[in-house]
Amino acid sequence: MFRGLNPIAVDAKGRIAIPARYREPIESEADGILVVTIDTEERCLLIYTHPQWEQIEQKLENLPSYHPASRRIQRLLIGHATEVELDRSGRILIPPVLREYAGLGSMVMLVGQGKKFELWGKSQWETAREDWLAEELPKGDDLPPELRSLSL
């Protein structure tokens, strides 16, 4: 499981160093191969281990191709999906088109989200986080059923 916030510098070639604590699970589960694609809801990138991405890709391919929303999601997620491999230094190269989409500069935030990572520009992450914290959360009956029983 990937969790936690990780500020990371982007080098001149567009590479980021995956934190050491994640490298062994990525190597053992996916032979060091990750898949990077766009998030269609936020201007960030999604990073999956290769086996995890294959499951998602299969679900995307099973969507009805005659439905415009399904085709749009397939085109965006599968079309932008790029395999990247950890190098000997534990770095991955984020392709320029994906860096541009997410507005990634010299500092990024790698955000663990369980089975995947999100990769945000540092300032975009900080702005989004502050916006989320400032939002008034629904209460009681306005909460989705899945959240009503969640106790933290």
From Swiss-Prot:
<keyword id="KW-0677">Repeat</keyword>
<protein>
    <recommendedName>
        <fullName>Transcriptional regulator MraZ</fullName>
    </recommendedName>
</protein>
<dbReference type="InterPro" id="IPR037914">
    <property type="entry name" value="SpoVT-AbrB_sf"/>
</dbReference>
<dbReference type="GO" id="GO:0000976">
    <property type="term" value="F:transcription cis-regulatory region binding"/>
</dbReference>
<dbReference type="InterPro" id="IPR020603">
    <property type="entry name" value="MraZ_dom"/>
</dbReference>
<dbReference type="GO" id="GO:0009295">
    <property type="term" value="C:nucleoid"/>
</dbReference>
<comment type="subunit">
    <text>Forms oligomers.</text>
</comment>
<dbReference type="InterPro" id="IPR035644">
    <property type="entry name" value="MraZ_C"/>
</dbReference>
<dbReference type="GO" id="GO:0003700">
    <property type="term" value="F:DNA-binding transcription factor activity"/>
</dbReference>
<keyword id="KW-0238">DNA-binding</keyword>
<keyword id="KW-0804">Transcription</keyword>
<dbReference type="InterPro" id="IPR038619">
    <property type="entry name" value="MraZ_sf"/>
</dbReference>
<dbReference type="InterPro" id="IPR007159">
    <property type="entry name" value="SpoVT-AbrB_dom"/>
</dbReference>
<dbReference type="InterPro" id="IPR003444">
    <property type="entry name" value="MraZ"/>
</dbReference>
<dbReference type="GO" id="GO:2000143">
    <property type="term" value="P:negative regulation of DNA-templated transcription initiation"/>
</dbReference>
<dbReference type="GO" id="GO:0005737">
    <property type="term" value="C:cytoplasm"/>
</dbReference>
<keyword id="KW-0805">Transcription regulation</keyword>
<feature type="domain" description="SpoVT-AbrB 1">
    <location>
        <begin position="5"/>
        <end position="52"/>
    </location>
</feature>
<feature type="domain" description="SpoVT-AbrB 2">
    <location>
        <begin position="81"/>
        <end position="124"/>
    </location>
</feature>
<dbReference type="InterPro" id="IPR035642">
    <property type="entry name" value="MraZ_N"/>
</dbReference>
<comment type="similarity">
    <text>Belongs to the MraZ family.</text>
</comment>
<keyword id="KW-0963">Cytoplasm</keyword>
<dbReference type="Pfam" id="PF02381">
    <property type="entry name" value="MraZ"/>
</dbReference>
